From Swiss-Prot:
GO terms for biological process: protoporphyrinogen IX biosynthetic process from glutamate. InterPro entries: 4pyrrol_synth_GluRdtase, 4pyrrol_synth_GluRdtase_dimer, 4pyrrol_synth_GluRdtase_N, GluRdtase_CS, GluRdtase_dimer_dom_sf, GluRdtase_N_sf, NAD(P)-bd_dom_sf, Shikm_DH/Glu-tRNA_Rdtase. This is Glutamyl-tRNA reductase. Homodimer. The gene is hemA. It comes from Methanocaldococcus jannaschii (strain ATCC 43067 / DSM 2661 / JAL-1 / JCM 10045 / NBRC 100440) (Methanococcus jannaschii). The active site is at 39 (nucleophile). Catalyzes the NADPH-dependent reduction of glutamyl-tRNA(Glu) to glutamate 1-semialdehyde (GSA).
Length: 392
């Protein structure tokens, strides 16, 4: 197997964007290949032993990619599936992206039996890692840490969540919020159209910014993520809010410190969240050795399967080779019987000798090409056993 790899470790997002390929053109060009493209990586997975045997490889700028071969390529793929090669260690999204890449290749009929087995084993390994270890537990982004903190302290099920802001920081919490069983999500933003768009994505409702005080009275959890140059939430504005958790992930801050004086308000800032995220990331990294053990186990199982597959393929090819030799010798024998006045017994004798001679000649050539002494001795031993068996 061969993998061409370009990822966030070597390129920024805009540079990776230039390396992305059109999927339709890719699958029109390449056989036995899978294209894996995310915002942080572009990887091409080939079922091939050398670059020279890949038809269409000249269409790829190989200098832009790191190239992995054989066992190293397979191990890398398993690490990718487990989230060990991700920017955020253990993230779940890559597993879904790998599945989708596999399904696309399968749909196009561009995947060999061997490559399919390797990909499915990688996906299975990624699933095992997430079930048997804590590699994907705990929010490690500011957005997911905000949601995790709210859930730990107050619980999210059946709660009303107010999201203030609809910019980049607000988008950090969207995915994490979607997965929770929240009673209602309200989005407030100075530009109502942006609030409306975000609310639609979250299955919530949008309000105009002048309705913020009213929304604050009903909210159990407030996540503030505006791009305002000055605080928008202070003690005076929140004095009638009741028991509320406020999570401020804006930079600069959306909240003032005097909010902490209110007995029913629990305020957490981006600094608190950063500590949560860093602690969670540390815990994930502690799980890496356990994941690597799972990878080793699954690689060993895959090796056993691939060895068996290679053996079955070799036997099939050997059978085809013998059949081809047999057909040629049969045709020769038929011509002799037709054109020459020779006894059938003699023709059959000549036919069997010619068949054996041809096969023995090619077996000798195989022995001559074996460079590994142990392999040579093993083959010689087995052929000797075969010879002794036929004497009895």
């Amino acid at each position: 197997m061969i993998i061409l790899k370009a990822d966030y470790k070597k390129y920024n997002v805009s540079e990776l964007e230039k390396l992305r390929m059109d999927e339709e053109k890719f699958y029109e060009t390449f056989d036995n290949a899978i294209l894996l493209q995310t915002c942080n990586r572009v990887e091409i997975i080939f079922d091939a032993d050398s670059l020279e045997e890949i038809k269409g490889i000249e269409n790829i700028d190989l200098e832009k990619f790191d190239i992995l071969f054989g066992d190293k390529a397979i191990e890398h793929l398993f690490r990718v599936a487990c989230g060990l090669e991700s920017m955020i260690v253990g993230e779940d999204q890559i597993l879904g992206q790998l599945k989708n890449a596999y399904l696309k290749a399968k749909e196009k009929g561009r995947i060999s039996k061997k490559l399919e087995k390797i990909i499915l084993k990688a996906i299975h390994t990624g699933q095992r890692a997430r079930v048997e270890t804590k590699i994907n537990e705990g929010g490690v982004s500011i957005g997911s840490a905000a949601v995790e903190l709210a859930e730990k302290i107050f619980g999210l099920e059946g709660k009303n969540v107010l999201l203030i802001g609809a910019g980049e920081m607000a988008n950090l919490v969207i995915k994490a919020l979607k997965e929770k069983n929240i009673k209602a999500i309200i989005v407030a933003n100075r530009t109502y159209e942006k609030a409306e768009k975000l609310a639609k994505e979250l299955g919530g409702m949008a309000i105009k910014f002048d309705k913020l005080e009213e929304a604050l009275r009903y909210a159990d959890i407030v996540i503030s993520a505006t791009g305002a140059p000055h605080p928008i939430l202070n003690k005076e504005r929140l004095k009638n809010a009741g028991k509320t958790i406020i999570i401020d992930i804006a930079n600069p801050r959306d909240t003032t410190d005097d909010i902490r004086e209110l007995p029913d308000i629990f305020l957490f800032t981006i600094d608190d969240l950063r500590l949560v995220a860093e602690e969670n990331l540390k815990k994930r990294k502690e799980e890496i050795p356990k994941v690597e053990m799972i990878i080793c186990e699954e690689l060993e199982r895959l090796k056993e399967f691939l060895d068996k597959m290679r053996f079955e393929t070799a036997i099939k090819e050997l059978g085809q080779y013998i059949e081809n030799v047999r057909k040629k010798e049969v045709e020769k024998a038929k011509k002799i019987l037709k054109n020459k006045n020779k006894p059938v017994e003699e023709v059959l004798e000549d036919f069997s000798k010619a068949l054996c001679k041809r096969i023995i000649y090619d077996i000798i050539k195989i022995f001559e090409n074996v460079e590994d002494k142990e392999v040579f001795e093993c083959l010689a031993k087995e052929f000797k056993k075969l010879g002794n068996k036929n004497k009895n």
